[in-house]
Amino acid sequence: MTRRLIRFYDPVRMKAERKTSETEIKLEMNLHGTGQYRFDTEIPFFEHMLSHISKHGLIDLNLWLRGDIEIDCHHSVEDTAILMGTTIHKQLGDKAGIFRYGHFTLTMDEVLTTVAVDLGGRYFFKYTGPELTGKFGIYDAELSLEFLQKLALNAKMNLHVFVHYGDNKHHVHESIFKALGKALRMAIAQDSATAGAIPSTKGVLE
């Protein structure tokens, strides 16, 4: 199996492609956008979840995806997370002036979820909450954890997701992705009080 990742960096937006024997993905991302998105993935529920990251994170996303969904959606979701995470890490550059940390507690009907992130360059992922099982159309619910883990790994991000309580599986998913968008928005934002300094006593972030 061949893997290729092509990245084009500029301060405003990033275009990236990933092509393997299982998937082909084209992505354009602007971390400092207005929450505009356009998806063509053939996986409707996945698009629905990604739209929440975009809208609530004010991250512009343009995603085209073709994968081996005749088998299942695993490769498509996993490879999208790899590409998105890599793109986030690359676009942040040296991370000068950003807040670095972000957290948000979000309610959706009976569900309460907290998401916390640290963009300091050290990977960790922890999910606490109800087991994610079942299907939404062709999308297996447990793929959301695969997406979050691979996103955090490739963005070199510390990501904690805590679903305090809630029963409706759709609401649980929405609360996670919306809160993630909100937390990323906080972490990526420029902190005017730091005058563009690196947000670490080490003076450098990977």
UniProtKB/Swiss-Prot annotation:
Pfam families, sorted: IGPD (PF00475)
GO terms of biological process kind: L-histidine biosynthetic process
InterPro entries xref list: IGPD_sf, ImidazoleglycerolP_deHydtase, ImidazoleglycerP_deHydtase_CS, Ribosomal_Su5_D2-typ_SF
Biological or metabolic pathway of the protein: Amino-acid biosynthesis; L-histidine biosynthesis; L-histidine from 5-phospho-alpha-D-ribose 1-diphosphate: step 6/9
Compartments, record wording: Cytoplasm
Catalytic activity: D-erythro-1-(imidazol-4-yl)glycerol 3-phosphate = 3-(imidazol-4-yl)-2-oxopropyl phosphate + H2O
Gene3D superfamilies from the UniProt entry: Imidazole glycerol phosphate dehydratase, domain 1
Signal peptide: none
SUPFAM superfamilies: Ribosomal protein S5 domain 2-like
Domain of life: Bacteria
Primary localization: cytoplasm
Class in the EC hierarchy, top level: lyase
EC number in record: 4.2.1.19
A cellular component annotation (GO) from this entry: cytoplasm
Gene Ontology MF terms in the entry: imidazoleglycerol-phosphate dehydratase activity
Keywords: Amino-acid biosynthesis, Cytoplasm, Histidine biosynthesis, Lyase
NCBIfam families for this protein: PRK00951.2-4 (NF002114)
Family: Belongs to the imidazoleglycerol-phosphate dehydratase family.
PANTHER family the record matches: IMIDAZOLEGLYCEROL-PHOSPHATE DEHYDRATASE (PTHR23133:SF2), IMIDAZOLEGLYCEROL-PHOSPHATE DEHYDRATASE HIS7 (PTHR23133)
Record's protein name: Imidazoleglycerol-phosphate dehydratase
Organism of derivation: Leptospira borgpetersenii serovar Hardjo-bovis (strain JB197)
